[in-house]
Design a protein with these regions (language model features):
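N-terminal accessory targeting/assembly segments
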Residues: 1-96, 101-104
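Short alpha-helix capping/helix-loop boundary micro-motifs
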Residues: 13-17, 48-54, 114-125, 158-163
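Short, surface-exposed secondary-structure boundary micro-motifs
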Residues: 20, 34, 70-71, 89, ...
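Residue-level "contact hotspot" at macromolecular interaction interfaces
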Residues: 22, 58, 123-129, 161-167
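Generic structural signal for short, solvent-exposed loop/turn connectors between secondary structure elements
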Residues: 32-34, 164-167, 181
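Short, compositionally biased
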Residues: 42-48, 78-89, 145-165, 184-201
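P-loop NTPase nucleotide-binding/switch module
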Residues: 97-143, 147-152, 169-217
Length: 217
């Protein structure tokens, strides 16, 4: 857990804390007794400004604001398809099963099923050199879409151990690598990625025709 402060001002979905206590820009915070999810959007010597991504009715000055110590992130793994999320990757179907059609204040649930087993084909072998974006496994997520599990950006090394093909959860360690700095890293099918940070791409092709859906956006 990161830095803890207290609410000084409330203006709709925006709250402020007096001074700069050491929060970071885009850091995720939990606001009030219901631990509403928010994000640090502005820092100055005089105050810290936070955007709360839930209804702030009932909040009052003096309530605690706890920093998470990391940016607001989403989990990327098999299970995203056929799911419905809100803007901070809360699974709406799962919350509805527990609480009904309306999301209660501070509702929390795992974004993805951590216990579901996925048929997994490992695509690397011991001794392979891998880098960010290398495909280490494939999972048939639907009948028509294969989820390709990639090495996280910024990571590279040599594969030292692999699990055999089989059924695994998104939290099971399936590949181990020796990184270029001499460390060891065990990899699962899950990546956590900051929502404000664009995913890196090797090439970006210019659009030459519109995507026509027939739906009004």
């Amino acid at each position: 857990m990161g830095i803890t402060g207290n609410i000084y001002g409330i203006n709709g979905p925006v709250i402020t804390i007096q001074g700069n206590l050491g929060y970071k820009m885009n850091e995720m915070v939990y606001v009030g007794e219901h631990r509403l999810v928010g994000e640090v959007i502005r820092l100055s010597k005089e105050k810290t400004t936070i955007q709360v991504y839930e209804e702030t009715s009932g909040l009052k000055p003096g309530e605690e604001v706890a920093g998470a110590g990391c940016a607001i992130s989403v989990k990327l793994a098999p299970g995203i398809l056929n799911n419905i999320f809100d803007g901070i990757e809360r699974p709406l179907q799962k919350i509805a099963e527990k609480s009904g059609a309306f999301i209660p204040t501070g509702a929390q649930a795992d974004a993805l099923d951590r216990e579901k087993l996925w048929e997994t084909h490992i695509t690397v072998q011991e001794g392979d050199e891998v880098a960010g974006g290398s495909i280490i496994a494939e999972v048939p997520e639907t009948k028509s879409i294969v989820h390709r599990v990639m090495l996280p950006p910024g990571v590279s090394g040599t594969v030292t151990a692999v699990k055999p093909d089989g059924d695994y959860t998104i939290c099971d360690e399936i590949v181990t690598i020796r990184t270029t700095d001499g460390g060891t890293r065990a990899l699962t099918m899950t990546q956590e990625w900051p929502i404000r940070k664009p995913r890196p791409v090797k090439d970006r092709y210019p659009a030459d025709r519109p995507l026509v859906t027939g739906q009004r956006i």
